[in-house]
């Protein structure tokens, strides 16, 4: 009975390990199913815990351009250090670039096809979480990389010209969208800073008002004590 239980536990552990490896490895997939590449453009906000590391994977083909922008929006905790470390790694795990600031960008050309790792490290704060807005993705200059493109028929010169013009317009609109998202990140960060300053000024004004009222009450109390004298039959106040 005991050997059967031991074998069953080993089977369960192997299944759990295989499931975990499938969840954590972005490159893992069956040979029969196509590889899930994900979206080419991503923008969202995330909260990084104290001393934690948050990583994301962006798929990119060779000869593309990958951009990674970040903006610290606010700090949730006692610390006031708004700096965060951003890193980018190749699909093989080699470091490409590092940025450590309140806001920054990492842009580079993709030299190989695969999942590029983008990480945020909140190593400067041990007691405060940081809310960061992210905007990252990949774009391609010139013809889009596609394995099926070689099998398509060649279009005539007029359609090629229309396609090139449309692609140039699309690239320009895409870059406008990138700059718009970066400006939106700055706007949200300024809003949280303004809200924090407003709360600080209100609390400081309230504390000063209470201090003024308390000091006035104490002064009135001590002045009243100076002019108040106890009178008895043998001890009377003198002029």
Swiss-Prot record:
The keyword Metal-binding does not apply. The chain crosses the membrane at residues 201-223. Keywords: Endoplasmic reticulum, Glycoprotein, Membrane, Signal, Transmembrane, Transmembrane helix. It is found in: Endoplasmic reticulum membrane. InterPro entries: Emp24-like (IPR015720), GOLD_dom (IPR009038). It holds the Pfam family EMP24_GP25L. Glycans are attached at residues 156, 197. It is a single-pass type I membrane protein. Residues 53-138 form the GOLD domain. It comes from the Eukaryota. Residues 224-239 are cytoplasmic. Residues 1-21 form the signal peptide. Residues 22-200 are lumenal. Belongs to the EMP24/GP25L family. This is Transmembrane emp24 domain-containing protein 6. It comes from Mus musculus (Mouse).
